[in-house]
UniProtKB/Swiss-Prot annotation:
Family membership noted in the UniProt record: Belongs to the GcvT family.
Keywords: Aminotransferase, Transferase
Catalytic reaction equation(s): N(6)-[(R)-S(8)-aminomethyldihydrolipoyl]-L-lysyl-[protein] + (6S)-5,6,7,8-tetrahydrofolate = N(6)-[(R)-dihydrolipoyl]-L-lysyl-[protein] + (6R)-5,10-methylene-5,6,7,8-tetrahydrofolate + NH4(+)
EC numbers for this chain: 2.1.2.10
One matching Pfam family: GCV_T_C
Function: The glycine cleavage system catalyzes the degradation of glycine.
A single cellular component GO annotation: glycine cleavage complex
GO-annotated molecular function: aminomethyltransferase activity; transaminase activity
Coiled coil: none
Gene3D superfamilies: Aminomethyltransferase beta-barrel domains, Aminomethyltransferase fragment, Probable tRNA modification gtpase trme, domain 1
Name of the protein this chain belongs to: Aminomethyltransferase
Source taxonomy: Bacteria, Bacillati, Bacillota, Clostridia, Thermoanaerobacterales
GO biological process, one term: glycine decarboxylation via glycine cleavage system
Length: 374
């Protein structure tokens, strides 16, 4: 095992013990010892785009909300509209503070009007859980943080369904995009399986008790060995989500960045009644956005990185939220949060790389066309 020296104080997923077998390079991610890569970020990225990759995402948090008032409680807590959700459907949404900033972005799994599973970002588990408890008020709900009991694997890529199908009698083609099925037997283990992911490709996220994670990881890799399936780390997960224009909390979203500034207003439903942050977001919408998230492509050499300054007219207009050499597009591209008046597609900006202003042009931030099965 290569990478971080002081792993002792970090949290570990149930798969940590077998990382050395796969030559994982370990980093500290939000207090977790996680594989940034196995073979290489680029080869893992390409495997997901062309065949499939298997990710350990057991660091993600799971919080159950149940009880008579589960629906009205979540409808008030979250920006998206849960009234449109069918049983066994998944919803992407934000949990905002009273200023409209994002406490977290998350997935809601609806079992029924009085039972939901929320899947939250690893760095925000405790913060989210406290925020939910603090806002429970008069609602008759039970809120349980079950993150420590549940492991999660994600198989992503055009061959994901074909590979996973080898391990189950369940017809996976019947699980539609952003739907899930519980108690699906994968290699004999009862799992929750959803057609969701964070790569821009088709695929599944699989939730199971911790004690079955190692077995399932190895069984899935074995089933996919003739299909080009590779174990994939957080490095490829980040380049994949970035190409697909999907936000990362702490980069494109945060308590100081609203969903509207991030260009994700679609997931904020102003017509659904009251919710925390609504007034601030409505005011921002009516007054017009001062900042916008944009995509850009470097004209010259130079790879933009998170935090780099962006300039126009010889003044600072914002900063890079994420930047990479795109393995799929073979270009240096980035996302930046900048002054709205410079945010038109086609505008030239400059990114300060090693103290030099390098030219870039604003482009559509969905760099890669998503290949979801709908």
């Amino acid at each position: 095992m290569k990478g971080c020296d002081s792993l002792d104080n970090l949290k570990k997923t149930p798969l940590y013990e077998i990382y050395p077998k796969y030559n994982a390079k370990i980093i500290d991610f939000a207090g977790w010892a996680m594989p940034v890569q196995f073979e290489s970020i680029i080869s893992e990225h390409e495997a997901v785009r062309n065949a499939a990759g298997l990710f350990d995402v057991s660091h993600m948090g799971e919080i159950i909300v149940k009880g008579k008032d589960a629906f009205p409680f979540l409808q008030n807590l979250l920006t998206n509209d849960l009234s449109k959700l069918n049983d066994n459907q998944v919803l992407y949404t934000f949990m905002c503070n009273h200023n409209g900033g994002v406490i977290d972005d998350l997935l809601v799994y609806k079992y029924s009007n009085n039972y939901y599973l929320l899947v939250v970002n690893a760095a925000n588990i405790e913060k989210d859980y406290k925020w939910m408890l603090n806002n429970a008020g008069i609602y008759k709900v039970e809120i349980e943080n079950v993150s420590d009991k549940i492991a999660e694997l994600a198989i992503q890529g055009p061959k994901a369904e074909e590979i996973l199908q080898k391990l189950t009698d369940e017809d996976l083609s019947q699980i539609k995009f952003f739907y899930f099925k519980d108690k699906v037997k994968i290699a004999g283990v009862e799992c929750l399986v959803s057609r969701t992911g964070y790569t821009g490709e088709d695929g599944f996220e699989i939730y199971m008790p911790n004690e079955h994670a190692v077995t399932l990881w190895e069984k899935i890799l074995e089933a996919g060995k003739d299909y080009g399936l590779k174990p994939a780390g957080l490095g490829a997960r980040d380049t994949l989500r970035f190409e697909a224009g999907l936000p990362l909390y702490g980069n494109e979203l945060g308590e100081d960045i609203t969903p509207l500034e991030a260009g994700l207003g679609f997931f904020v439903k102003f017509d659904k009644g009251n919710f925390i942050g609504k007034d601030a977001l409505l005011k921002q919408k009516e007054q017009g956005l001062k900042r916008k998230l944009v995509g850009f492509e470097m004209i010259g050499n130079g790879i933009p990185r998170h935090g780099y300054e962006v300039q126009a007219d010889n003044q600072k207009i914002g900063y890079v939220t994420t930047g990479y050499f795109s393995p799929t597009l073979k270009k240096n591209i980035g996302l930046a949060l900048i002054d709205s008046k410079y945010a038109q597609i086609g505008n030239q900006i400059e990114v300060i790389i090693r103290n030099k202003p390098l030219k870039a042009v604003i482009v559509d931030k969905n760099f890669y066309k998503k290949n979801y099965k709908k």
